[in-house]
Structure formats: C-alpha cells, structure tokens
Design a protein with these regions (language model features):
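Cyclophilin-like peptidyl-prolyl cis-trans isomerases
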Residues: 1-186
C-alpha cells in the first residue's frame, strides 16, 4: 500500500525537496485562512489561497512551498495579456514533483491575478501553476484548478507579463521565484 508524503511544518524548517514518491497527505485546516507571499526577482506579491473551494490544490501548493520547492524556480512561459506560468524546477515546462493529483471543480470565474494549476489534461496537476495576467486568461474554460487570488502586488503580475520573451514565450531575462512563504490565520 502506498503512503502519502508526510506534511511538513510551516515554520521553514522542512528540508528542500523537489521530488516525491507520493502526493502529500492532507495537512491543511480548511477552517483557516492561508496566504502565500511569493517573492520574485520583480518584487513580492501576496496571494490569498482558497482552501474552501480548492482544498486539495491548496494542500499541494502549501506542501510544496513548505519544502522550498519553488525557491529559485523560474516563470518559464509568459504571454502578455494572458498568463505567467511557473512551478517547474527544470524550467522546461515538462517537470513536476513526481506525482499527479486530481482536478477540483472551478467554482469562481478567473480574473486578473487568479492563481490556477497548469495541467496536461484532466487530473494531471502537479507543481506547475499560472497567474492570469490579462483578458485572454480571464476567458479560459474552467478546467484549471483555481486556488488563489493576488490580493497585493498585482503590479508585479503586470510587470511580469511585460518582460521580453523569445518565440517560445520564454523570458529572455529570467523571472525567478526567490521564495514562497505560507502564513496561516484563523
């Protein structure tokens, strides 16, 4: 029988890990409010995570952030007016944590600053996510787990979408996630 990966403490003491054998055990409390502060090479943004409507996705993101999974990872795909995609430690768009998890019903419309999971089809979520940065992203069909909203630092999302990119939408100057810190409140 497979065991889930144990859920780490949120105090920054968890080891740095980027590969796992199993998806994480459920370790968040959906009655609490979770916030992610994502510090990037362009500045910091604060993201309210939606543990009520996307508990499995928030659990996964918090688990990975607690393991410093996203530290030093780039946004590898940026399309102005659409979205900024990151969360792949290989920086290629093909990497992930070593497991996949199921989709959750999208209960709210995407808006600029929405945080959602990137996927390769139904139930293929892992570590990659995107931030909606423009009208093309707002119009996406509800097939990407929507699990957060930027509540401070939308100007960072806007600056990110405006970086110069190559023909494959890869930023010519890397946009790096320095760290993701999780806060919990009642």
């Amino acid at each position: 029988m497979s065991m889930a990966s144990p859920f780490p403490a949120l105090d920054g003491s968890a080891p740095v890990l980027q590969q796992f054998d199993q998806a994480p055990e459920f370790g968040i409390d959906t009655s609490k409010r979770y916030t992610a502060t994502m510090d990037t090479s362009l500045g910091a943004m604060v993201i309210a995570l939606d543990a009520v409507n996307a508990p499995g996705t928030v659990n996964n993101f918090v688990f990975l952030a607690a393991h410093h999974y996203y530290d030093g990872v780039v946004f590898h795909r940026i399309i102005n007016g659409f979205m900024c995609q990151g969360g792949d430690p290989t920086g290629t768009g093909r990497g992930g944590p070593g497991y996949r998890f199921n989709d959750e019903p999208v209960k709210q419309k995407y808006q600029i600053g929405s945080l959602a999971m990137a996927n390769a089809g139904p139930n293929t979520n892992g570590s990659q996510f995107f931030l909606i940065s423009g009208p093309s992203g707002v119009g996406l069909p509800p097939q990407y787990n929507h699990f957060g909203q930027v509540v401070k630092g939308l100007e960072i999302v806007d600056a990110m979408q405006r970086v110069d990119t190559d023909h494959s939408d890869r930023p010519r100057t890397p946009v790096v996630i320095n760290s993701v810190t999780i806060s919990v409140a009642d």
